Design a protein with these regions (language model features):
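Residues immediately C-terminal
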Residues: 118-119, 133, 149
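Structural recognition of the conserved hydrophobic beta-strand(s) that form the central parallel beta-sheet
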Residues: 111-114, 127, 138-144
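Short N-terminal helix/helix-N-cap motif within the alpha/beta-hydrolase-1
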Residues: 121-124, 310
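Charged, glycine-rich active-site and insertion segments that engage polyanionic ligands
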Residues: 1-38, 46-49, 100, 136-139, ...
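Clamp-loader machinery-focused feature within the broader ASCE/P-loop NTPase space
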Residues: 1-122
Length: 314
């Protein structure tokens, strides 16, 4: 078992399996018969309690909505107020109270906090003292996909560790296991971040968009079929990045099978125009992260691309 006592803050892109990695670390720390490399055995009493979700020495601090999505909490009753997307100060206080109890099984105790950027300043402040001086044998494993959104006071108390994207082979295997129809295309589209809820989100629409820009299909159909704004904006950003790459003679990252089409589009617009479009999309993506209704409509963005649109004779 690790002797590092500083709270660990694991960070990396969304969809790379960060929550699974935190859960695995908790399992490794709590297992009562780990293997030689320190991995949880999966069948001791502690591992069985963990898989039943009833281990008393593990505490998961998550936003309510995420806890339900990740199977860490039961969905709220019908008619209850919608689950929160933030980690509340009350939830932090419950963790702090729990942290002072003694271990039920006489071993390590683990607090998981994910994502730490879901704590507003008051909630984070309520956690600082416990992070600074955790009770004996308490481990903090925290995670974030947005390290730049983590409060400096919290960040400075943690040991930062970056988590990379899955390797291509592992990403393809994970997609095949989920019966993905076109694992290669999806792995490229999400750049191997296959543990996202929907790694393929926006791909079909992006292909329609690309076809329309290349003179096939109708704009109205594209607008009507647009995914939610947050997905649409990211899809358009990916097309833009690939077009900018094509302009510089580089292979596409997200749409590797469509290099020829991307090269035709890339040539239709000045490089600076592509860059400015990308910047507008990045700003819109930051807004939609906070509020999905951030005044963004697919129509506005499709129009934004309208003058790139190649005539159908091409
Ligand atoms: Zn075990």
């Amino acid at each position: 078992m690790s002797t590092v006592r500083a709270p660990l803050l694991l960070h990396g892109a969304a969809g790379i399996g960060l929550w699974d990695a935190l859960r695995q670390r908790a399992a490794d720390a709590l297992c009562e018969s780990p293997d030689a490399s320190g991995r949880a055995c999966g069948h001791c009493a502690a591992c069985r309690l963990l898989s039943a979700g009833t281990h008393p020495d593990r505490f998961a601090l998550l936003p309510e909505a995420l806890a339900v999505d990740l199977g860490e909490a039961e969905p709220a009753e019908r008619g209850a107020s919608p689950p929160s997307r933030d980690i509340s100060i009350d939830a932090v206080r419950r963790l702090v109270a729990w942290s002072h109890a003694t271990s039920h099984r006489g071993r390590a105790r683990v607090a998981l906090v994910y994502p730490v950027d879901a704590m507003a300043a008051p909630a984070a402040n309520a956690l600082l003292k416990t992070l600074e001086e955790p009770p004996p044998s308490l481990y903090f494993y925290m995670g974030t996909h947005r390290l730049d959104h983590v409060l400096p006071t919290l960040r400075s108390r943690a040991l930062l560790q970056a988590m990379g994207r899955p390797e291509a082979a592992a990403a393809l295997a994970a997609l095949r296991q989920r019966d993905c129809a076109d694992p290669e295309a999806v792995a490229a589209w999400c750049r191997n971040a296959v543990h996202a809820a929907q790694p393929e989100a926006g791909l079909d629409w992006a292909l329609d968009m690309l076809a329309w820009l290349d003179g096939q299909g109708a704009r109205q159909a594209l607008v009507a079929a647009a995914p939610p704004p947050a997905v649409a904006v990211v899809a358009l950003q990916k097309i833009t990045v690939d077009a900018m790459r094509a302009r510089h003679g580089l292979a596409p990252l997200y749409l590797p099978r469509h290099a020829a089409r991307l090269r035709r589009l890339a040539a239709a617009v000045e490089p600076m125009d592509w860059l400015q479009r990308w910047q507008r999309l990045a700003r819109a993506a930051a807004e939609t992260h906070v509020a999905l209704h951030a005044g963004l409509s697919a129509e506005r963005w499709v129009l934004e691309f309208d003058h790139i649109h190649l005539p159908s004779e091409v």
